[in-house]
Amino acid sequence: MNWLIFTGKEDKKETEALAAFLKSKKISYSIIEANAEYFSHAHKANKDDTKKLYAQLHKTTHCICTGMDDISPSPLFLYVAGLFSGKQLPVFLVPSKGNLPERIADSLGKTFADVPALLKSLKKNFPEYIKQEVQNSIKKKLFNLGVPLTPDSFSNYIARGDLDISKLFVKAGMDASICDSAGTPMLCIATRSNKLPLVSWLIKIGANINAASEDRGYTALMDAVWKNNYEIADLLVKAGADINTIAKDGQPLMVIAAGICNIKICKLLFENGGDIDLKDRMGMSARDYAKLFRKQVLIDLFEAKRR
């Protein structure tokens, strides 16, 4: 972060307090003594000073203005207001007389009654400023890599199994539980793509483990069973995934598992609370299908609990 403090000539103590705070946070900052007269005549300064000032303005990420009363809409003021507004930079205003013309307050940022009030706000919100700065840095990195910061782009890298790039999306502020444009959660995409490391990572960072896709209404665990992937199914079960979910077509998870007939997966679900008597729209349960299609290994598994 690069903070800029515009300060009036009579605001030395306030400026020192602000500088001390930024220094305590190990944040880069610079100070420009600038009252109304400075803003009115700065554009007439020599070429080198003007270049230095404009370079300073362009590298600024946050700005504090103290003692900025009676500023006329000079070329410099209009430039600063337009630049900071266009870049959506946080600007904090502390008028020396406690009152700032509306044209300035509305154009630039948030007004505080005095420096102590501003410092109180900064102390409270500084972790968020740091978080936002990190996100902006990651967004810039993704841009330079030619990677769009969109849910569909995120899902593409999830499906590829690219953990490093996927982590950048989350660091840039993307929600781990977000869905792509088709309505498929990232955890389901990772599962359907058989990307165990991505599934593990998404669970770890708090992705909604029971989120269902728009297409089939499958959760990640249902996708793991459908893909016949025991390792991912086991991971999801251990993470607390719901074992008795029902798909859009009315199929309970245990019915899907019985259809796949992977004894290892069926045993995993059954022993962790899978309901073998939960029926689909045909009125059939996992137990019923096992008997109908004479899947003896499943019949034995399901009957074992009765003994």
Where are these regions (language model features)?
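Ankyrin repeat A-helix N-terminal signature
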Residues: 156-161, 189-195, 223-229, 256-262, ...
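Conserved TIR/SEFIR loop-to-helix hotspot centered on a Trp-containing motif
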Residues: 69-86
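Conserved N-terminal substructure of TIR/SEFIR domains
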Residues: 1-60
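Start-of-repeat signature of ankyrin repeats
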Residues: 150, 183, 216-217, 250, ...
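Ankyrin repeat boundary/linker residues
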Residues: 147, 180, 213-214, 247, ...
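Ankyrin repeat structural motif
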Residues: 162-170, 195-203, 229-237, 262-270, ...
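C-terminal interaction surface of TIR/SEFIR-family domains
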Residues: 100-167
